């Protein structure tokens, strides 16, 4: 659990070929005030086997142009002796805002046909993330799966929102030129989250649909009796 305001540098930085078995961001509120700051940066040959975000809000106070998570195309098999054969990416009840507005989110995180990857993404809100223009060219799901590797990703998706204020209609949960790279769960909530004041870091929800499904970081939801 943590609160970090105006993070100027990566929360976690590694420039060598080290690997973590797991990294969890839980019950955190983090604002980043520099567009080029990478949140988690493995700029060498490093890797995180299991990476999870839960009950957290991470947002840029200016449109973020950097990767949210950067790893240099490693896979579990690159770490001999680890015994790793699978990898997990999990996002549950999180709120993300203005991340990867230059078509960036994750890079080369799911990159190998010889590894098994699991993606669990549920009750999470992505607002103004991973879109580069008024017409939009990217999508959250596509960028996590590193376009073209969907076949070896075992994914569980439920009640996520992909809202883009600059896109006509407000939603673009996939790259229109890449039909595979979208949320096919049939559960995506295509209604504006209606944050109270996102520009000033208040992501309290007024959308009845999101409140009913308990979407996003719980800190922005009304308490239940």
Which residue stretches match the model-derived regions?
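Surface beta-loop-beta hairpin patches that serve as ligand-binding interfaces in beta-rich domains
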Residues: 178, 198-225
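Extracellular beta-rich repeat passengers
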Residues: 1-201, 224
